[in-house]
Amino acid sequence: IRKFCEMKIIKAKKITKKNFSKFGQLIDTSKKNPININDGYAKRFDNLINLDASKNKGKAIVSIFKAKKRRFPMKIDMMEKHPLGSQAFIPMDDTKFLVFVAPRGNKPNINKIQSFVVPKQTGINYNAGIWHFPLISMKNMNFLIVDRKGKGNNLVIYKFKKDKIILKK
């Protein structure tokens, strides 16, 4: 019996708090009530994500990623997950980007993969264990990353061997 590979073309759709909720949280200030601080010269938006870094005595770290512009349509040949902690991507540039995700599991379920366009001035936080493709930038851009560092294997990579997945923006 010969198993045929499946070809799937995925088009990115607009992200919303609701359609992204099973993968993580949006990081924005549009629907939050800020706290006035610094004698009214600043507004503080608290508790924007569910940061998860403490498994196996891990700690939260902040990094900067410099991402290169991707070409579309693009082939998706792998996905990764971080089982021991969440991972937040906060753009430092006024540019939208794409995310490519699948629910938790032993491997990505090709029938449940989704892609979203993340608007300007919005970040995302992946829950621990969510399958995702590395950064997909529409332009060269910088990201502030809040991630986990510590003991244990916090990176699992899955390579698609037979299935062919194409992402269109």
Regions found by a protein language model. Give the residues of each.
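Short, Lys/Arg-enriched N-terminal segments with co-localized hydrophobic residues
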Residues: 1-6
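Non-catalytic, conserved peripheral segments adjacent to functional cores
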Residues: 7-115, 147-160, 166-169
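Residues that flank catalytic or metal-binding motifs in active/ligand-binding sites
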Residues: 85, 122, 139
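Conserved metal-binding segment of the jelly-roll/cupin
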Residues: 117-131
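Generic alpha-helical secondary structure signal
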Residues: 120, 135, 162-164
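Short, surface-exposed linear segments at secondary-structure transitions and domain or protein termini
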Residues: 122-125, 165-169
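A short beta-strand-loop micro-motif that forms or neighbors metal/cofactor-
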Residues: 130-157
